[in-house]
Amino acid sequence: MTSVVVVGTQWGDEGKGKITDFLSADAEVIARYQGGDNAGHTIVIDGKKFKLHLIPSGIFFPQKISVIGNGVVVNPKSLVKELAYLHDEGVTTDNLRISDRAHVILPYHIQLDQLQEDAKGDNKIGTTIKGIGPAYMDKAARVGIRIADLLDKDIFAERLRINLAEKNRLFEKMYDSTPLDFDAIFEEYYAYGQEIKQYVTDTSVILNDALDAGKRVLFEGAQGVMLDIDQGTYPFVTSSNPVAGGVTIGSGVGPSKINKVVGVCKAYTSRVGDGPFPTELFDEVGERIREVGHEYGTTTGRPRRVGWFDSVVMRHSRRVSGITNLSLNSIDVLSGLDTVKICVAYDLDGERIDHYPASLEQLKRCKPIYEELPGWQEDITGVRSLDELPENARNYVRRVGELVGVRISTFSVGPGREQTNILESVWASI
């Protein structure tokens, strides 16, 4: 039994797709356990970029099984579109498996997402308007429609009719919005269900059988710990649990079967949307990092907010997700800066604190306490070992590991597979 969980340790966009793709080379099964098509990851293979939102990164390995687990909320329209995109690129999807227990995102979820966000005015949380939150709301309220229901024509019609009647009343009476048509949704989405039917199964059986047989299973999280609905910057969070604990709920695999948790982070920090961000940069350094790092959302295209590396955030992520190994990405983006900074603690009303407050009001008053390190001017994109890094870059990497309290297993100096450098094999250490 060998399993590794990959989680984002910041606010998403840390390069999880790249690291998952890298670790997938030694895995036999790759599974997603939460989120939906609000999560975007970019994978570079032989210089070619692939952008995925729902399908696991392991799909590019045809001999390996890729799983969309029960904790994922699936937009069938987006899924069918993504499958077509992969087929057009010559990528087979015969190795894809989709949980019959996963919940379905329907047009009324997306419309409700938009209406709710608009109604918040200045208090918007920055949702991607993909219907993720409303779909998880229906799931928690026990009125959601699952993939298994979507495939059964009569059950789908019955449940869609009940749900749509309720949502349309909400649209008309509360939001003064246009109701949606039952027939149009039913025909379109039932057809999508038939298109994906071949991939649908009980994925918990596949995952547990693989683990019991001693196969290597890799679990891929979406978003990041700081967007976790329980452990993140609530309410500026997603509606699921990206933390490693979400694996057990979102995949049907027990906690005793998890061996390693790899936390993925960038050498700086970024986030899309609103919410607290203590180390955010508003100056020319921030603009430079954004442009050099191509910090624009994979899903939304929105410019990401950027800031210095925050070890307070990282220690929080380490605690709540049980991180055993760290993968540090995008070190190359910091090349050319005379000085690089790391937030080591916060100043809250004159008191130094080392933990991440739950209170948004306290977070607004938190000022980062920085440790400054000398930067490096060299181009490091061709570096293939820690020793090849300039001394100042090497010191930066080591200091990050010390402050977070987790050993660094890999570091990356660019988006390509070949630009990921191994310090310690995660699989070999299990």
Swiss-Prot record:
Its EC number is 6.3.4.4. Keywords: Cytoplasm, GTP-binding, Ligase, Magnesium, Metal-binding, Nucleotide-binding, Purine biosynthesis. Disulfide bonds: none annotated. It is found in: Cytoplasm. Mg(2+) binds at residues 13, 40. One of its GO terms (biological process) is IMP metabolic process. Substrate binds at residues 298-304. Its main location: cytoplasm. Gene3D superfamilies: Adenylosuccinate Synthetase, subunit A, domain 1, Adenylosuccinate Synthetase, subunit A, domain 2, Adenylosuccinate Synthetase, subunit A, domain 3. Its cofactor is Mg(2+). Homodimer. Plays an important role in the de novo pathway of purine nucleotide biosynthesis. Catalyzes the first committed step in the biosynthesis of AMP from IMP. This is Adenylosuccinate synthetase. The gene is purA.
